Amino acid sequence: MQFALMSGLVAFLATVLLIPRFITFYQAKRIEGQQMHEDVKQHQFKAGTPTMGGTVFLVVAILVSLLFATAFQLLTGGVLAILFILALYGVVGFLDDFLKIFRKINEGLNPKQKLALQILGGIVFYFVHVRGAGGGELNVFGHMVHLGVLYFPFVLFWLVGFSNAVNLTDGIDGLASISVVISLLAYSVIAFNEQKFDILLVCVTMIGGLLGFFVYNRKPAKIFMGDVGSLALGGMLATISIALRQEWTLLLIGLVYVIETSSVMLQVSYFKYTKKRFGEGRRIFRMTPFHHHLELGGLTGKAEKWSEWKVDFFLWSVGLIMSLITLAILYL
């Protein structure tokens, strides 16, 4: 356990030291910062804030994990698989951010390009790690269900789905970074109890990196992680749940990401249905993803506006409670 804490501390200190230099470089080169969607009026003042900060904590977490895993003879296939997805999905996010900021392409990678690259990463992960490790059984609330060839599309769905879910969650200061810290703390406990010390190392290292990033990402944020960070973190969580053979746990531990994604899907579907049925589109939520609904009118959407901190603490609490419930189901 000490090696993991040391690794996390190194990642924390490195990120805390490097982020200000990244911000200084960003501003010195007069790079255009974060663009704000015109519909999110309450966040327009944040336009121009440096973004792509995920580049820093990703590089730090990957290098520190490799260093400590090698030093403590924990450089396993599981570690390499997690770091592979972290790096590849980070590259996908980096390309998306790069096109938006440097090439002035508003949508970055189009949805088909992004999906194709995410699926490619999932295919490599499956055939190199999952299939090689004899995967094919899905853990459903503690019961192993043999899926055979169907486990392959499940893996792709899990990786792509949660990668995009965390991306949707990254919409207000500090929300995604601490939500993922809470999720990784839960997986650290699971990895420790299952004696998967290699995966424990990676989890704690990323926790250190994210806490270092949060120093500058908390409200008022001096930097955002960008798609380079959020897409990679979602892919990482999905990979960890698969590597631990505890896939089902991500539905509870990652309930915040599920809520955020579901709110968008419900909103779009209901709007299209009502427009076709009644001639005008209607909405379930004030705005999606769900954190914007909370900002504009609390849980009901009709109450007074919530501050970003209130939204953060509410959704962090949901993540923490669900993580504790998951651990209780597993070990009590």
Curated annotation (Swiss-Prot):
Q: How does it sit in the membrane?
A: Multi-pass membrane protein
Catalytic activities = UDP-N-acetyl-alpha-D-muramoyl-L-alanyl-gamma-D-glutamyl-L-lysyl-D-alanyl-D-alanine + di-trans,octa-cis-undecaprenyl phosphate = Mur2Ac(oyl-L-Ala-gamma-D-Glu-L-Lys-D-Ala-D-Ala)-di-trans,octa-cis-undecaprenyl diphosphate + UMP
Per the annotation, which location comes first and is thus the protein's main one? Answer: membrane
Please provide, alphabetically and separated by semicolons, the GO molecular function terms listed in this UniProt record.
Answer: metal ion binding; phospho-N-acetylmuramoyl-pentapeptide-transferase activity
Quote the subcellular location field of this record.
Answer: Cell membrane
TM stretches of this protein: 3-23, 52-72, 74-94, 115-135, 140-160, 172-192, 197-217, 223-243, 248-268, 311-331
Cofactor(s) needed = Mg(2+)
Which keywords appear in this protein's UniProt record, sorted alphabetically?
Answer: Cell cycle, Cell division, Cell membrane, Cell shape, Cell wall biogenesis/degradation, Magnesium, Membrane, Metal-binding, Peptidoglycan synthesis, Transferase, Transmembrane, Transmembrane helix
Q: EC no.?
A: 2.7.8.13
Q: What class of enzyme is it?
A: transferase
Q: Does the keyword Secreted apply?
A: no
Signal peptide range equals none
UniProt KW Ribosomal protein keyword: no
> Which Gene Ontology BP terms does the record give?
cell division; cell wall organization; peptidoglycan biosynthetic process; regulation of cell shape
Q: Name one GO cellular component term.
A: plasma membrane
Specify the pathway: Cell wall biogenesis; peptidoglycan biosynthesis
Under the heading HAMAP family, the entry gives: MraY
Q: Which NCBIfam families match?
A: mraY (TIGR00445)
Family membership, please give it.
Belongs to the glycosyltransferase 4 family. MraY subfamily.
Functional description taken from the UniProt entry = Catalyzes the initial step of the lipid cycle reactions in the biosynthesis of the cell wall peptidoglycan: transfers peptidoglycan precursor phospho-MurNAc-pentapeptide from UDP-MurNAc-pentapeptide onto the lipid carrier undecaprenyl phosphate, yielding undecaprenyl-pyrophosphoryl-MurNAc-pentapeptide, known as lipid I.
Can you name this protein? Phospho-N-acetylmuramoyl-pentapeptide-transferase
Task: Give the species this sequence originates from.
Answer: Streptococcus suis (strain 05ZYH33)
